[in-house]
Amino acid sequence: MSTNFEKHFEVDVDNCSLEQLRDILVNNSGKAPLANRFRALFNLKGHAEEFASKPEDALKATQYLAEAFGDESELLKHEVAYVLGQTKNMAGAPLLRDVLADDKQQCMVRHEAAEALGALNDVDSLDILEKYFKEDPLLEIRQTCELAIDRIKWETSEEGRREALQESLYSSIDPAPPFSLEKDYKIQELKDILNDQNRPLFERYRAMFRLRDIGNDEACLALASGFDDPSALFKHEIAYVFGQICNPVVVPHLKEVLARPEEAPMVRHEAAEALGSIATDDVLPVLKEHLKDSDSVVRESAIVALDMYEYENSNDLEYAPV
């Protein structure tokens, strides 16, 4: 490990108890580096996913994760909401509904809570999602609720059960499924759907994830064209999938988005983390530059991204060892 990154590994979270992981996550000591708080988060996620075999520990892990919603870090809280949606543990649903309904939480955190309810396929959350889709003053929240509603309805529909989808290379539960393999979409056709603002957002996301699953240079450049969209939500999802694909062809596009002074923090932060995942040599100075960014979400994302950069250039097999 290089000395530049040692400060990100000051606390060893391997083989910690659930309570020790919670203490690191919520920074009870006041000294836990952000990168290690993220490690504790992902370790707790692993426990929360074991609800079938270890229900008591899984419930406890879910509750400990939710304790972080009282933190000041917008980045950490949004990641907690994301993780709760990825666990498939329905114990997280009422906790996420509370976050969505809390107008004192930042937009990025509430958005992630709504998206997580969709990832959980929580039919019981349709009413609250409909409420905020119709009534919330923030476009990002309305759009996220729209996607979550459409995802839940698709998952529980005959169409959703019937469609033949490509087996994903990625473990994430996405806000929309990719387009079915039943039609042989050309990349240009998918690009046109992606950028057609007259189409439903759910359909455009389906094109996005189909392009992600193709993942070659042409598909990635088609995705990058979406960075001209007016929707911050849409652009942040494109940056997120670039962090999954890790194709260096998009590095110039991510750098440009990260450097936009007028761009929404939810987009810039996702671009920073994607650069950390891609981890080519030209990424390091860019991430270091944004350790002093004027926006706290982007600054913290640069810390996490640099931690990921170090991981990608090491021989470790797991980002969050359990």
From Swiss-Prot:
Q: Which GO terms describe its cellular component?
A: cytoplasm; nucleus
* Cofactor info, note text: Binds 2 Fe(2+) ions per subunit.
Q: Locate the residues binding Fe cation 1.
A: H78, E79, H111, E112
- Secretion signal: which residues? none
Q: Which domain of life is it from?
A: Eukaryota
Q: In which pathway does it act?
A: Protein modification; eIF5A hypusination
**EC numbers:** 1.14.99.29
Residues that coordinate or bind Fe cation 2: H236, E237, H269, E270
Q: Which UniProt keywords apply?
A: Cytoplasm, Hypusine biosynthesis, Iron, Metal-binding, Monooxygenase, Nucleus, Oxidoreductase, Repeat
SUPFAM superfamilies (UniProt xref): ARM repeat
Repeat positions for HEAT-like PBS-type: 76-102, 109-135, 267-293
Catalytic activity, reaction form: [eIF5A protein]-deoxyhypusine + AH2 + O2 = [eIF5A protein]-hypusine + A + H2O
Q: Which cofactor does it need?
A: Fe(2+)
Q: Where in the cell is it found?
A: Cytoplasm; Nucleus
InterPro entries, alphabetized: ARM-like, ARM-type_fold, Deoxyhypusine_hydroxylase, HEAT_type_2, PBS_lyase_HEAT
Uppermost EC category: oxidoreductase
Any GO molecular function: deoxyhypusine monooxygenase activity
Hey, which family's this protein in?
Belongs to the deoxyhypusine hydroxylase family.
| Function of the molecule | Catalyzes the hydroxylation of the N(6)-(4-aminobutyl)-L-lysine intermediate to form hypusine, an essential post-translational modification only found in mature eIF-5A factor.
Q: Which HAMAP family does the record cross-reference, listed alphabetically?
A: Deoxyhypusine_hydroxylase
Name used for this protein in its record: Deoxyhypusine hydroxylase
* Source organism: Kluyveromyces lactis (strain ATCC 8585 / CBS 2359 / DSM 70799 / NBRC 1267 / NRRL Y-1140 / WM37) (Yeast)
